[in-house]
């Protein structure tokens, strides 16, 4: 089992996650990479809008200091 948050996050590489940023932006995608600052790269990412429609974003890079949470969506 991972002993620290960064190690745990790295075990999620290749899995589908939901990410929320400080400005309320929520996106789901496959975790492609994570670095020591918890900056993330997501592939096949998409955002679900308030009306339920999905908006494809493709590859997305998120800065670690702007993240509120990361949740596993698939195992």
Tell me what each language-model feature is.
Residues 1-75:
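Conserved RNA-binding domains used in RNP assembly and mRNA/RNA metabolism
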């Amino acid at each position: 089992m991972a002993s620290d948050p960064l190690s745990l996050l790295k075990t999620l590489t290749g899995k589908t996650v939901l990410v929320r940023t400080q400005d309320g932006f929520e996106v789901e995608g496959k975790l492609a990479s994570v670095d020591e600052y918890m900056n993330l790269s997501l592939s096949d990412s998409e955002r679900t809008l308030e009306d339920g429609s999905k908006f494809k974003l493709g590859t997305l890079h998120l800065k670690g200091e702007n993240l509120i949470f990361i949740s596993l969506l698939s195992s």
